[in-house]
Amino acid sequence: SRRVASLGFGNALLVRALIRKLASGPEILIIATPEAPTAVDKAQIVMKILYIEFCIRISLKYNMIIWLASYPKSGNTWLRMFLKSYFQKSDTEFKLQDTITDDFQSKGFPSLSILKHLNIDYFKFSEVVKNWELMQDFINLNNKTNFVKTHNSMCTIGPYKFTSSRNTLGGIYLIRDPRDVLVSYSHHVGLDYQTTLEHMSSSDNYESTTTHKMTLLGSWADHYNSWKNYKSSKILIIKYEDMVLDTFNTFLKILKYLSEIDDAIIDENKIKRSLKQTAFGRLQKMEKKQGFIEKGKSELFFRKGKTGAWKNELSVDLSKKIEKKFNKEMVELGYL
């Protein structure tokens, strides 16, 4: 089959889109030229061809996303902070605001800043969905591995997939007991437990700004199953409870996974150092002193960070509702 693409030189995103097309099959590339090209015109055409060749060459090196995915309040921020501490220079002191960088896409995906940069109408959720992969193409323009936070379900809406192997190298999916998620999430968003459970049970559940939908969560079970069943790239599933109760071995497992899919180097002394730097109590003290951009409506983002807090917070009736609603997944994960 033949497809035709035209190129406007200097548009890196367009070049990348072209490379994606070239990789999928035979292609004819048309570069507009003047009827009587001058020496300067010819030189520019040659430069275009060389530039395309360069882009194709660097695209062969994997420059992909590793998702840091979770339902809200499941340990995503802690994981990002640990990884930031681990991969920064050994003599650098970790600071709470250090995660607010492009390297770790702390604002999450989809990102309002990227939507604005690409002139995508973020007031229409359908436009956000349509451009999921375009935004990921944009992130991957830096030609390196990108850790990207997301609370989005690994879903398909109409013909649009949340991601594919073209942009995704792998992912770490964090899962937490839904009873603890409910307690923590309700404090974060300022809703009562019953209303929060209704949101967590709905397949039509979104993270939104005051004016528009941004992230499709779905129900807690939908979310977990969508990432568990993603087959295009290997996804590592980590329980928040293991992060808390078997911290060193769990983070070692994460780094072993990263060494398998990327070129991460495992250094047990660095793991211990980074765990000390990002210990919950230390993060809590830093937040009290410095504040934290991700804080919701609760007094602190790093509120408790414990496992099993639901036992002292939820009524027996509400606990049973959660266990009935998510019984299959909770049994599978060992929560029941």
Predicted regions and their residues:
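Intrinsically disordered, low-complexity segments enriched in small polar residues
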Residues: 1, 6-10, 24-27, 34-37
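Non-catalytic, well-ordered alpha-helical segments in soluble enzyme domains
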Residues: 87-89, 250-264
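Phosphate-binding beta-loop-alpha motif at adenosine-nucleotide cofactor sites
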Residues: 69, 232-257
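Intrinsic low-complexity, disordered N-terminal segments enriched in polar/charged/small residues
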Residues: 17, 26-31, 36, 42-45
